[in-house]
């Protein structure tokens, strides 16, 4: 289960996607499959980009637990200790529809003080978080224990962004700036988004209850 466009993006860059079985037999995050896939790839190559779409994974809605993240980080730190370079991309496009905003971000504390050869990346989507889907806008945020790595990331990102799409959507940039600077507008935005989040959760709860009643298998 994954967003199919990852394939298209990788193909354009001359890379390929390798998947792992997301859920185990009891519909929990499949630690064994994840580790086995990472181990197999890093036997053949010196670096690896890992993409994890969480919280509120597309298309399943699944969110990794704190224990799931501990397993993921134990796995990548093991390979980092062997000299491998790991890029861990966390696609948080739907984070603001995954739960209480502080709780859904708590896992980010786990990425402090990682080895220098682990670069953590967060892919953020304003289009989703700001209920602005028709205006495509987002951000790529990097976290590293090395200032040199962050400086290099900044320079490469500026070059790649300019070469790929020049400048991003001006209307979206303007809206984001105004909302962040206006406390009244920001409060109104949060209220609107929270109402939509509650609606999504209510619909999801109804579906899961009725699926259980009629014996329809459903993903967690």
Where does each model-flagged region fall?
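Short beta-strand->loop structural element characteristic of the AMP-binding/adenylate-forming
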Residues: 16-26
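Conserved PLP-binding catalytic core of the aspartate aminotransferase-like
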Residues: 189-220
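A short acidic (Asp/Glu
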Residues: 7-11, 60-66, 94, 98-108, ...
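Conserved core segment of the aminotransferase class I/II
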Residues: 113-197
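Alpha-helix termini
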Residues: 38-45, 73-86, 111-116, 144-149, ...
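Short, solvent-exposed loop/turn segments at secondary-structure junctions
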Residues: 2-4, 55-58, 94-96, 127-129, ...
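Active-site phosphate-binding strand-loop segment of PLP-dependent enzymes
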Residues: 24-100
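Substrate-binding/gating loop at the entrance of the active-site cleft, primarily
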Residues: 1-15
């Amino acid at each position: 289960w994954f967003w199919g466009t990852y394939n298209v993006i990788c193909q354009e860059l001359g890379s390929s996607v390798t998947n792992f079985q997301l859920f185990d037999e009891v519909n929990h995050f499949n630690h064994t499959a994840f580790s086995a896939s990472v181990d197999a790839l890093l036997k053949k190559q010196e670096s690896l980009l890992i993409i994890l779409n969480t919280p509120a994974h597309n298309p399943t809605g699944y969110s990794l637990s704190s224990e799931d993240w501990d397993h993921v980080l134990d796995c990548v730190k093991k390979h980092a200790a062997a000299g491998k370079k790991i890029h861990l991309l966390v696609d948080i496009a739907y984070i603001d529809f995954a739960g209480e905003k502080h709780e859904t971000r708590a896992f980010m504390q786990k990425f402090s003080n990682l080895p220098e050869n682990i670069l953590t990346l967060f892919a953020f989507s304003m289009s989703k978080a700001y209920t602005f889907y028709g205006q495509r806008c987002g951000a790529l945020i990097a976290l590293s224990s090395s200032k040199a790595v962050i400086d290099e990331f900044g320079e490469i990102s500026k070059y790649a962004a300019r070469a790929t799409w020049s400048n991003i959507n001006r209307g979206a940039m303007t809206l984001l700036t105004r909302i962040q600077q206006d406390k009244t507008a920001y409060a109104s935005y949060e209220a609107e988004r929270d109402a939509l989040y509650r609606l999504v959760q209510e619909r999801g709860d109804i579906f899961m209850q009725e699926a259980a009643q009629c014996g329809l298998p459903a993903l967690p």
